[in-house]
A protein has these predicted regions:
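Short, charged amphipathic alpha-helical "coupling" segments at sensory-output junctions
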Residues: 254-255, 259-268
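Sec-exported extracytoplasmic/periplasmic mature domains
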Residues: 20-27, 54, 58, 82-89, ...
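Hinge/cleft segment of the Venus flytrap/periplasmic-binding protein
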Residues: 41, 45, 57, 147, ...
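Loop/turn elements at helix/coil->beta-strand transitions in domains of secreted/extracellular proteins
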Residues: 2-3, 29-33, 59-65, 90-94, ...
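Hydrophobic alpha-helical segments within soluble ligand-binding/sensing domains
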Residues: 6-33, 76-79, 103, 128-133, ...
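An alpha-beta-alpha
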Residues: 16-67, 159, 168-183
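Hydrophobic alpha-helical
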Residues: 52-53, 66, 70-131, 156
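Alpha-helical transmembrane signal-anchor helices
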Residues: 208-258
Length: 269
């Protein structure tokens, strides 16, 4: 209870949806071998994903289920699955890896053993980008990957609601979606379009910064010109005042001179 609000992915639902996908790929009347590759089992995401997957698998008869803990990493997943393939000669029909990185490591081990075509491989994260989950699905490395939602926009909305004191849900679970070969290409295209728009926004932002700096520089130059013009105007006013003052003094001196000459002529007369 020592938190204001929580928003995050439903890891149990991710495991459950992965299990449901695996079940949909099973053939009736056949025993199956299932391998679950988890992260650190003591971690909450790993435990919740395992529980969801286990609940989806609980009513499957003749299922052999094994587990590998791979610490969320490619190298550990590759090494431990390779050991299983070599020492036990046990090839699973399905692999559910708790992230796409471990799924990729398991695929590499299967390729080395020559059994990659016999395994349906499911991961988690479904990130877009070179060599990431959506690419792996599109390239046939993974059969499916569950989206791990981050909800950035919803997080911002929730934070604003908390700050503004408006009503908000205290706990928000973000739903997942499954990416398969049928929609991976669409997601790649959407991501490419978003990336292009993001690049355009960054370009416009840089242009705006440049224009702002240019405007600021021009404004400073204009202010300097105005100051200089003001100084010139003040100096001009002083010069005009001095000139007019000089004219006035000259007139006064001329009058005084004329008066002195008149007085001198009167004395001579």
């Amino acid at each position: 209870d020592k938190y204001t609000a929580y928003i995050g992915a439903d890891n149990y639902d991710i495991g459950l949806r992965a299990g449901e996908y695996v079940k949909s790929c099973m053939k009736n009347g056949h025993s199956v071998r299932i391998l679950e590759i988890s992260g650190m089992r003591a971690s909450t995401p790993a435990e919740e994903r395992h529980n969801g997957f286990e609940d989806a698998m609980h009513n499957i008869e003749d299922a052999q289920v094994r587990y590998i803990e791979a610490d969320w990493t490619y190298d550990v997943a590759f090494r431990r699955f390779s050991q299983m393939l070599i020492s036990d000669k046990w090839v699973p029909d399905f692999i559910f890896a708790h992230n796409d990185v471990m799924a990729k490591g398991a695929y590499a081990a299967a390729v080395n053993a020559g059994c990659e075509k016999d395994i349906i491989l499911v991961g988690v994260d479904a990130l877009c980008g070179n060599g990431l989950g959506v690419d792996l699905v599109n390239d046939g490395v993974l059969d499916a990957s569950l989206v791990y939602p981050t909800g950035g926009y919803k997080v911002a909305q929730l934070a604003m609601a908390v700050l503004e004191g408006t009503p908000y849900a205290r706990e928000i679970s973000l739903s997942t979606e499954i990416v398969t070969a049928s929609n991976a290409r669409i997601m790649q295209m959407q991501h490419s379009q978003i990336s292009m728009m993001d690049d355009k926004i960054k370009t416009l932002d840089s242009l705006l910064d440049y224009r702002t700096m240019e405007y600021s520089a021009q404004r400073k130059i204009l202010m300097t010109v105005f100051v200089l013009l003001g100084l010139v105007l003040i100096l001009l006013c002083i010069a005009v005042y001095g000139f007019r003052r000089a004219l006035t003094l000259n007139k006064m001196l001329e009058i005084q001179k004329q008066q002195i000459e008149v007085q001198r002529e009167e004395k001579l007369a």
